[in-house]
């Protein structure tokens, strides 16, 4: 009985520690770009292209080197709040959750506190203007913020846009829920076993398997370690340039 109580106590303690970790806020800074309609945020270093079509809309941000992680953070979600203790330009009581869709490159010609906002090791979010104006006043230009990584809430299944050529497949993965960021991918043709893919750039994953004419399945591992499988999501007659929506998702 004592052992059982001890196990319950340990489980409760672990749950409290996990909750505390999930609630941790980290200081950073934020600016904005892309115009009032966010048209200048389309495309970007994650490869999502039309952010409306990809399902991300205007709630997006470009991440500094310290956060972008060479593209491994593409698709991750962050809740950002302006730090009212450090600036008068916040909109008090507000926060917004954004998706990482782009890279904010360093500018080594300027110091980190005078224009080189995204220089390492600074944690910085260059937000879309509509997202920024949810939490801060336009004229401020830059504000101190606090952020935390949060689960991504997505509608529908993970989507796979198959590009490339007959000798390789370049697959753009979008609409990933849960962690949001893809750490590893595998591809399988209807006549093959599972084969590991490699990150080409951003959210684009490459295979040199020559799978023309075979139905395609994908296995996705998020950066929290969870794995889902999208079986036969692209039929045997799939074509380059098409996007295929699966029923698989990190719920």
From Swiss-Prot:
Residues 167-246 form the Expansin-like CBD domain. SUPFAM superfamilies: Barwin-like endoglucanases, PHL pollen allergen. It comes from the Eukaryota. It is found in: Secreted, Cell wall; Membrane. GO terms for cellular component: extracellular region; membrane. Residues 1-22 form the signal peptide. Belongs to the expansin family. Expansin A subfamily. This is Expansin-A8. It comes from Oryza sativa subsp. japonica. The gene is EXPA8.
């Amino acid at each position: 009985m004592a052992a059982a109580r001890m196990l319950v106590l340990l489980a409760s303690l672990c749950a409290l520690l996990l909750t505390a970790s999930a609630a941790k806020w980290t200081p950073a800074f934020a600016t904005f770009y892309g115009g009032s309609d966010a048209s200048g945020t389309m495309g970007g270093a994650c490869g999502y292209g039309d952010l409306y079509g990809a399902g991300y809309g205007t709630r997006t941000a470009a991440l500094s080197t310290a956060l972008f992680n060479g593209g491994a953070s593409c698709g991750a979600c962050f809740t950002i709040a302006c730090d009212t203790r450090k600036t008068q330009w916040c909109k008090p009581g507000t926060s917004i959750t954004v998706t990482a869709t782009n890279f904010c490159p360093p500018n080594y010609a300027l110091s980190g506190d005078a224009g080189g906002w995204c220089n390492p090791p600074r944690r910085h979010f260059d937000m879309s203007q509509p997202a920024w104006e949810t939490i801060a006043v336009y004229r401020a230009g830059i504000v101190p913020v606090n952020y935390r990584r949060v689960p991504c809430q997505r509608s529908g299944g993970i989507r796979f846009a198959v590009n490339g050529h007959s000798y390789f497949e370049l697959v753009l993965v979008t609409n990933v829920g849960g962690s949001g960021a893809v750490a590893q991918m595998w591809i399988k043709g209807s006549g093959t076993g599972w084969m590991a893919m490699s990150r080409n750039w951003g959210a684009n994953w490459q295979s040199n398997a020559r799978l023309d004419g075979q139905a395609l399945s994908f296995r996705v591992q998020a950066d929290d370690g969870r794995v889902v499988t999208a079986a036969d999501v692209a039929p045997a007659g799939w074509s380059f340039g098409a996007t295929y929506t699966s029923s698989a998702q990190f719920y």
